[in-house]
From Swiss-Prot:
Protein name per the record: NADP-specific glutamate dehydrogenase
SUPFAM superfamilies: Aminoacid dehydrogenase-like, N-terminal domain, NAD(P)-binding Rossmann-fold domains
Record organism: Neurospora intermedia
Annotated Gene Ontology cellular component terms: cytosol
Enzyme Commission numbers on file: 1.4.1.4
Cited InterPro entries: Aminoacid_DH-like_N_sf, Glu/Leu/Phe/Val/Trp_DH, Glu/Leu/Phe/Val/Trp_DH_C, Glu/Leu/Phe/Val/Trp_DH_dimer, Glu/Leu/Phe/Val_DH_AS, Glu_DH, Glu_Leu_Phe_Val_DH, NAD(P)-bd_dom_sf
Keywords for this protein: Acetylation, NADP, Oxidoreductase
Amino acid sequence: MSNLPSEPEFEQAYKELAYTLENSSLFQKHPEYRTALTVASIPERVIQFRVVWEDDNGNVQVNRGYRVQFNSALGPYKGGLRLHPSVNLSILKFLGFEQIFKNALTGLSMGGGKGGADFDPKGKSDAEIRRFCCAFMAELHKHIGADTDVPAGDIGVGGREIGYMFGAYRKAANRFEGVLTGKGLSWGGSLIRPEATGYGLVYYVGHMLEYSGAGSYAGKRVALSGSGNVAQYAALKLIELGATVVSLSDSKGALVATGESGITVEDINAVMAIKEARQSLTSFQHAGHLKWIEGARPWLHVGKVDIALPCATQNEVSKEEAEGLLAAGCKFVAEGSNMGCTLEAIEVFENHRKEKKGEAVWYAPGKAANCGGVAVSGLEMAQNSQRLNWTQAEVDEKLKDIMKNAFFNGLNTAKIYVEAAEGELPSLVAGSNIAGFVKVAQAMHDQGDWWSKN
């Protein structure tokens, strides 16, 4: 836990994990794991540095760069780089903390970390972004490596930025190695990587539908937030599987379907083009079957929905919006974004699950539901280490297996450690938290990172 009063995002992530551990039988059966939680909540290393670069007018600009190397008990630090003006140590510690247990749920050998800078790529020229990425990597390259720390993309860091950073690393270190994931296919990247988080989210929720007896996606109405990679590819996969996508959004507002047909593949392709040009959805020329709601999130405007998938950013579903989704008939909520729901919203969903039993909403946390992205990053690392490339079908099949295992790992762990009434769906948030934590805690114990009294 933080020793500072100014890390609200990290405190929220810690409290969410600690609450589920405390309200299970884990600490009763294994009281020594309290020590593990105390140790695991402090990063192994925090790297903070200045990034000095030159804008197109020849002016000196400076930003704050970070890398939080949180836990390496299961493998090299693994987690994205975020470029956004909101980036600070609290946000990166929250993301890195979540990443530890998310990576554990994939079953792959990856530790947890996160990094980035308070640089805003919006409105910057290609040359400015290149100069920033090179300046950022001039320091970061000293602290990363294929067997040490393997960053990836995140908000503000796509294929272009990964390319600039990889080139800067290669020149500075004089090595060509799998030090970053999300690379171009011709220089070490993996097929399915851009689609992985969205596809994996849909595969995960498919197991929720099947286990609960709700059937397939056919005919289900799905509300999505966000309009980046996660939302785009989740929407395309949902449509492929027969669902109706009723919303997308960005920081400027929400795009909501007005009729029964929903958002089409053509609409999503148009959104992709807009986002590729780094523009807002306000520039989307929507037809009569869609409406634009300025400054709004979609949850209270979508009408009847069966499934809600927050895919934009943290804390994007409030208590009031959670209650609104329940009133709209929503039965499944899964986070495509990290910590997409506030603690109060999660409480609404979990209380409903306990009270309504088989008729309740079923909530899945981001560390399980959106682990597909980092899973395929891990598969990219495996391909890099073997100097080979798998086919799209091979990667997709491995992704499906990872999401299936993440679902059943959380489900079965909840059955062991969380008491449930007859007919009550298991708590996926508790089960996923416990499963990820126990795996990491045991590895830390075996390696001497913590110990119990004899």
